[in-house]
């Protein structure tokens, strides 16, 4: 039984490693392009009236569920203006009454997400009622899946649009520069008008080709057009003179990401072009799986940027609190010294400087962001890239029991997973004092000497 299980695992690993690179369609030829008009004329799809009738029958069969979807969508739509007003009101007070609080920023992020929900809820409801009880290989199911995928693309786009709106979270709370906000807004609008239509058409046709094989070439051509459109959008978004890269160079010229933009910028732009080529060459399955990974990667970067913005906002709030506390301590020391006739300038030597706290915590935040990105990219891409799966077969060393049985194996993939852990440990040991001061010690009734001793002890704990 164990031998059979081992053989099954070997076959499963072989399939996972090589299935992605098996050609699933014939390459698109020039003759196929010339016959596209004839193919579309012969393609018999159900009329719109029949699809609408099927949708309505599913709605009337489940009236209470349909009413719940409708009420939720209408409620979110009616509250849209309320959400926007709350975001604007919080943003206007973020440097005033809320200057030393992080909670308003978290509230604004929640209101931003809520403001993006109404249209997505409507799309999801239509897709669910149309496809939930449809035949697996039917036009209704293909349209439902197309709407569902378009909704999945739309929701994060709409959240991003709400984040970068005037007086939004990105501007007022995160301090994103105009050099970043403007190209992001242009890219979101471009994808919203054109990209979502192409996403729906590509998904619908790629699914429909399993029913009508003759439209396979048309489906892959539409997919290739979508990928080239995304490549063009990324080209303009990451432009070195007017895009996000220009903003990155202006705000963080010494960061590792800014210094290496000549590597990652052309690589990111080339990925959709390669996917278009794969689809046209007949590797439609591989192109589809890699597109999902590309989609996840883009929103991993956006989510990481939002988390970094929240962390930077927390750091700013903490610095203000620490500055206020240190000012109060200095005033108290000065008053005590004046009352006793002692020198006040020697009584606060152990007080940690704000510049040191800021520098150490910034290093920790940036290192954490890079580690999250690296770990996320590894998790997203490892299932679809045989090169990464192949790392598990590179054995660096093994531990043997006295009878010669292998007890444990260390592969190259284990080392690559361990490296981020070692890096974060090094960063924690080096920057623990600033993090503790900003996160915990400012809230405790400790004097400067106790804070210094506690910082030292905890640094040793991380080291060992």
Residue ranges and their predicted role:
Residues 1-50, 55-59, 71-74, 343:
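N-terminal targeting peptides and non-cytosolic leader segments immediately upstream
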Residues 53, 57-419, 423, 427-430:
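Hydrophobic/aromatic interaction determinants used to assemble and anchor large protein complexes
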Residues 94, 435-443, 461:
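A short secondary-structure junction motif
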Residues 142, 146, 448-453:
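Internal alpha-helical transmembrane segments of multi-pass membrane proteins
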Residues 325-334, 442-452:
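Short helix/loop segment immediately N-terminal to the Walker
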Residues 393-398, 437-447:
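Active/binding-pocket-proximal capping segment
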Residues 420, 424, 440, 458:
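Active-site proximal loops enriched in glycine and acidic residues that flank catalytic Cys/His/Asp
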Residues 441, 449-464:
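Conserved structured catalytic cores and adjacent interaction surfaces
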């Amino acid at each position: 039984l164990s031998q059979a299980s081992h053989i099954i695992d070997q076959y499963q690993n072989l399939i996972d490693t090589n299935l992605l690179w098996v050609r699933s369609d014939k390459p698109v030829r020039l003759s196929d392009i010339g016959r596209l008009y004839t193919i579309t004329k012969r393609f018999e799809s159900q009329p719109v009236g029949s699809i609408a009738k099927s949708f309505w029958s599913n709605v009337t069969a489940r009236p209470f569920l349909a009413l719940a979807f409708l009420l939720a969508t209408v409620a979110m739509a009616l509250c849209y203006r309320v959400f926007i007003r709350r975001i604007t009101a919080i943003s206007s007070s973020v440097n005033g009454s809320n200057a030393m609080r992080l909670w308003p920023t978290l509230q604004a992020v929640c209101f931003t997400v809520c403001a993006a929900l109404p249209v997505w809820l409507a799309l999801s409801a239509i897709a669910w009622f149309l496809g939930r009880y449809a035949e697996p290989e039917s036009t209704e199911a293909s349209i439902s899946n197309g709407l569902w995928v378009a909704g999945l693309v739309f929701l994060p786009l709409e959240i991003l649009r709400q984040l970068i709106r005037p007086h939004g979270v990105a501007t007022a709370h995160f301090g994103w520069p105009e050099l970043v906000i403007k190209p992001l807004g242009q890219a979101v609008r471009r994808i919203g008008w054109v990209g979502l239509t192409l996403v729906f058409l590509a998904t619908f046709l790629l699914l429909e080709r399993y029913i009508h094989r003759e439209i396979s070439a048309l489906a892959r051509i539409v997919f290739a057009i979508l990928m080239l459109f995304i490549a063009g959008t990324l080209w303009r978004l990451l432009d070195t003179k007017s895009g996000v890269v220009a903003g990155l160079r202006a705000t963080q010229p010494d960061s590792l990401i800014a210094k290496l933009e000549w590597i990652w910028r052309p690589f990111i732009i080339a990925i959709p072009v390669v996917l278009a080529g794969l689809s046209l060459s007949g590797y439609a399955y591989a192109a589809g799986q890699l597109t999902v990974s590309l989609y996840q990667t883009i929103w991993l970067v956006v989510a990481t940027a939002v988390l970094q913005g929240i962390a930077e906002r927390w750091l700013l709030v903490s610095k203000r609190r620490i500055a206020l506390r240190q000012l109060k301590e200095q005033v108290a020391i000065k008053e005590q010294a004046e009352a006793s006739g002692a020198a006040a300038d020697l009584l606060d030597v152990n007080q940690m400087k704000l510049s040191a706290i800021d520098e150490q915590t910034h290093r920790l935040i940036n290192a954490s962001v890079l580690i999250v990105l690296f770990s996320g990219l590894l998790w997203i891409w490892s299932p679809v890239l045989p090169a990464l799966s192949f790392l598990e077969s590179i054995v660096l060393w093994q531990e043997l029991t006295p009878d010669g049985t292998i007890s444990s194996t260390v592969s190259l993939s284990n080392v690559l997973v361990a490296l981020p852990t070692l890096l974060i440990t090094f960063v924690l040991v080096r920057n623990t004092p600033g993090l503790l001061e900003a996160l915990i010690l400012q809230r405790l009734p400790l004097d400067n000497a106790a804070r210094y001793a506690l910082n030292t002890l905890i640094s040793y704990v991380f080291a060992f």
